[in-house]
């Protein structure tokens, strides 16, 4: 379902300056290349100015410095991409399933369902769970005993929220998400006694406006809770270990792993396939480039990176061999420096 609005209505909603025809009707969003007169696009990068000049869009969201390049009605804002997100949400609102419990769903006694809650096919909601108003539990989901879910949250297909976990308002859990599985806790016995499982007694607490991508997993705490504060966004296939705390508005890209008992600050940006060791802390405002390995605490905000860029195979092999020789080279350089220092000293004495 799409909504039809005029450009002036969109500009008012965005607080944007309007340059052009205010009565033009917009029905959809589109790329600059594919947009027609009923569509709105955006340009947030100077690399796309050629596409902007040639666009057939009815309107375009642009920065002030690009208005002269825009051949159609312009909505002028500081951040076109951020504004585009609001416009796309308005023009293409998500469709809601009907309120109520599907005949194939299982809802235990003692469950509290808020107004207009939807529980989809084959979903299971265990005893004592509380679902806030307008929350959607999708097909095949499992909501454990005593779980609390706030208003306007959406569990898509096959999501698991395990016993006693807490999910805030307006939270989105994409297909396959698991919240509250046991953390990885085992104690090694003497000799060949093997490993003894350590009970994981904490919960997972997700703040308001958290978004977890498909097949992402967040383990429950061993004793204390695992906490993702408000506004945290995780991409697909991210793993958060037990007792981790992720600060508000931090965003983590796909395939990243955060080991147990690590604290990540607020407003951090973590690139894909990064690996963060356990029992460390990362300050507010840290940016980790993709594939960064973090083995110790980061105490100052800023950008950090550790991946090796791709090289031709032959060059990479030579450098790999040289890397194994670094210790020997270091010792040789130290000996040469010591010898040079001694020689310079002897030369000075002879001169006297």
Curated annotation (Swiss-Prot):
GO terms for biological process: lipid A biosynthetic process. Its EC number is 2.3.1.191. CDD domains: LbH_LpxD. Homotrimer. Catalyzes the N-acylation of UDP-3-O-acylglucosamine using 3-hydroxyacyl-ACP as the acyl donor. Is involved in the biosynthesis of lipid A, a phosphorylated glycolipid that anchors the lipopolysaccharide to the outer membrane of the cell. The gene is lpxD. Pathway: Bacterial outer membrane biogenesis; LPS lipid A biosynthesis. This is UDP-3-O-acylglucosamine N-acyltransferase. SUPFAM superfamilies: Trimeric LpxA-like enzymes (SSF51161). PANTHER family: UDP-3-O-ACYLGLUCOSAMINE N-ACYLTRANSFERASE, UDP-3-O-ACYLGLUCOSAMINE N-ACYLTRANSFERASE 1, MITOCHONDRIAL-RELATED. It holds the Pfam family Hexapep. Belongs to the transferase hexapeptide repeat family. LpxD subfamily. Keywords: Acyltransferase, Lipid A biosynthesis, Lipid biosynthesis, Lipid metabolism, Repeat, Transferase. It catalyses: a UDP-3-O-[(3R)-3-hydroxyacyl]-alpha-D-glucosamine + a (3R)-hydroxyacyl-[ACP] = a UDP-2-N,3-O-bis[(3R)-3-hydroxyacyl]-alpha-D-glucosamine + holo-[ACP] + H(+). GO terms for molecular function: N-acyltransferase activity.
């Amino acid at each position: 379902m799409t909504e039809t609005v005029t450009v002036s209505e969109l500009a008012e909603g965005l607080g944007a300056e309007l340059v052009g025809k205010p009565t033009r009707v917009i029905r959809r969003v589109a790329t600059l290349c594919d947009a027609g007169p009923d569509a709105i696009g955006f340009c947030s990068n100077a690399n796309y100015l050629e596409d902007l000049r040639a666009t057939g869009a009815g309107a375009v969201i642009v920065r002030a410095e690009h208005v002269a390049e825009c051949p159609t009605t312009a909505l002028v804002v500081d951040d076109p991409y951020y504004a585009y997100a609001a416009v796309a949400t308005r023009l293409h609102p998500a469709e809601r399933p009907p309120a109520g419990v599907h005949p194939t769903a299982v809802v235990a006694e003692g469950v509290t369902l808020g107004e207009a809650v939807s529980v989809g096919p084959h979903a299971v909601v265990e005893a004592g769970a509380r679902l806030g108003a307008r929350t959607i539990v999708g097909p095949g989901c499992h909501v454990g005993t005593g779980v609390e879910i706030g208003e306007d949250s959406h569990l898509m297909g096959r999501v698991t929220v395990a016993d006693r976990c807490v999910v805030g308002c307006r939270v989105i859990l994409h297909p396959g998400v698991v919240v509250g599985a046991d953390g990885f806790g085992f104690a090694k016995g003497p000799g060949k006694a093997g490993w003894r499982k350590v009970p994981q007694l904490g919960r997972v607490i997700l703040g308001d406006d958290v978004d977890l991508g498909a097949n992402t997993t967040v383990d429950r705490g061993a004793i204390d809770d695992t906490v993702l504060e408000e506004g945290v966004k995780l991409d697909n296939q991210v793993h958060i270990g037990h007792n981790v705390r992720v600060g508000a508005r931090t965003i983590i890209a796909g395939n990243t792993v955060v080991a147990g008992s690590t604290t990540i600050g607020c407003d951090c940006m973590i690139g894909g396939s990064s690996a963060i060791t356990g029992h460390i802390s990362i300050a507010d405002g840290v940016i980790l480039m993709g594939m960064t390995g973090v083995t110790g605490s980061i105490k100052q905000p800023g950008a950090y990176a550790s991946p090796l860029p791709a090289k031709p195979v032959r060059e990479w092999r030579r450098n790999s061999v040289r890397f194994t020789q670094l210790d020997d080279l270091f010792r040789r350089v130290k000996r040469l420096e010591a010898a040079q220092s001694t020689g310079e000293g002897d030369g000075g004495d002879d001169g006297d």
